[in-house]
């Protein structure tokens, strides 16, 4: 049994056999990390020359040595193989000049229903394995410490088809998606030379929500590394087309109202038809308001296809991932993100991928998490990851460097 480096091809071959895996543990991500200045190694724990555990280990220089990290890994088929892997990894890190080794496992610590109620026991044995080997745990957290959340909202896609996808959404989600699709929103996959459009959306959103956006160069490199396994999607709306659709639908409604009025002339005491007339008349008035809004949009934007929102979706054999997104608040009433989500789930079905990961939520279930509320429309469930573990091959050296940095005001 030994820890060794392996080829990209051998890593990918093994990675495709495991049941749970993030896109972060992929050859595509390794390529992206390398292009972003990291030193990347494909490492494996082998038994009788067969890979039992594998991971992408990336490194960056820091004061006093290397920062080494395994994010969303390692990958394995048998849990029993994790302990010897983690134990040997400590020696490997020390021998290769690491001052800090960080591991963020992808194992699920606990599962919850869509509302945040536990549906499984806490899987403490995963943590115990690392702690008993001397790895320090940052603790179980909520929110997005370091920009990454340990709480994911996911949806199992097995058994769901294009025909019954809408039915699988929540009680609120079904009408939300139906309404969003009624506006005439078009979806487009961006080419590399169009990624500034995506960057504009995410910049607007990050400014509004006060978080650090990725650079255009990052998105371009992501596009290059992932190729057909990533979709940079935008949702657009032509307000001339939107207005025409409103007139058409209002015309159909007017015919229904006219028929009801004639029926009520014959049978004026029909409570059912009176209620229908009230409902249809209210809908007719709503169309008038929407047409007025549409005219204002036409005055402002003319006949162009206006971008409402955008999302980056990533595909792996085990799961697809909703990674980055943004929208323009001016167009919130068109619910474009819901149309993008439906597209992603349809694409997940088309590619035969068994799980869709909406990624981060805060892990706070008091109603304050608007991101969670949006994702709940699609009727998934919640998984909690274990968080971050750290090992310091030379703890005194690390503490001394940290103290010096603090004294110099660089911490």
What is each of the regions a protein language model found here?
Residues 3-64, 113, 135-146, 156-331:
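A conserved beta-strand-loop-helix scaffold within acyl/acetyltransferase catalytic domains
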Residues 5-8, 18, 31-32, 119-160, ...:
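Active-site/acyl-donor-binding loops of N-acyltransferases
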Residues 71-80, 158, 325-334, 362:
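A short, internal acetyl-CoA/4′-phosphopantetheine-binding micro-motif in the GNAT/acyltransferase core
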Residues 220-223, 311, 345, 372, ...:
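Generic hydrophobic alpha-helical scaffold/packing signal
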């Amino acid at each position: 049994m030994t820890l060794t480096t392996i080829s990209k091809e051998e890593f990918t071959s093994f990675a495709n056999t495991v049941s749970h895996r993030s896109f972060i543990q992929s050859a595509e991500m390794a390529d992206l990390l390398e292009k972003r200045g990291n030193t990347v190694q494909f490492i494996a724990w082998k038994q009788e020359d067969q890979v039992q555990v594998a991971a992408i280990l990336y490194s960056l220089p820091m004061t006093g040595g290397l920062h080494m990290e395994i994010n969303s890994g390692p990958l394995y088929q048998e849990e029993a193989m994790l302990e010897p892997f983690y134990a040997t990894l400590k020696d490997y890190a020390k021998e290769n000049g690491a001052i800090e080794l960080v591991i963020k496992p992808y194992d699920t610590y606990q599962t919850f229903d869509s509302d945040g109620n536990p549906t499984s026991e806490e899987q403490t044995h995963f943590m115990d394995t690392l702690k008993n080997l001397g790895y320090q745990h940052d603790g179980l957290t909520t929110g997005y410490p370091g920009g990454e959340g340990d709480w994911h909202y996911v949806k199992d896609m097995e058994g769901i088809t294009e025909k019954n996808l809408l039915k699988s959404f929540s009680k609120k989600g079904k009408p939300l998606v139906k309404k969003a699709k009624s506006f005439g929103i078009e979806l487009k996959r961006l080419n590399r030379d169009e990624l500034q459009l995506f960057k504009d959306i995410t910049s607007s959103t990050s400014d509004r929500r006060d978080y650090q956006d990725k650079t255009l160069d990052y998105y371009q490199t992501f596009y290059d590394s992932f190729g057909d396994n990533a979709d940079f999607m935008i949702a657009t709306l032509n307000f001339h087309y939107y207005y025409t659709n409103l007139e058409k639908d209002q015309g159909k409604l007017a015919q229904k109202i006219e028929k009801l009025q004639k029926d009520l002339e014959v049978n004026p005491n029909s409570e059912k038809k009176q209620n229908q007339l009230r409902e249809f008349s209210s809908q007719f008035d709503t169309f008038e308001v929407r047409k007025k809004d549409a005219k204002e949009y036409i005055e402002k934007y003319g006949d162009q296809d206006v971008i409402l929102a955008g999302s980056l979706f990533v595909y792996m054999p085990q799961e697809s991932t909703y990674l980055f997104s943004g929208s323009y608040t001016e167009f919130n009433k068109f619910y474009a993100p819901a149309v993008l989500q439906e597209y992603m789930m349809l694409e997940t079905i088309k590619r035969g991928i068994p799980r869709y990961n909406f990624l981060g939520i805060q892990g706070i279930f008091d109603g304050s998490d608007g991101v969670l509320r949006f994702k709940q429309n699609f009727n998934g469930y919640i998984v909690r990851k274990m968080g971050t573990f750290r090992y310091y091959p030379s703890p005194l050296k690390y503490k001394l460097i940290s103290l010096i940095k603090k004294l110099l005001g660089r911490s």
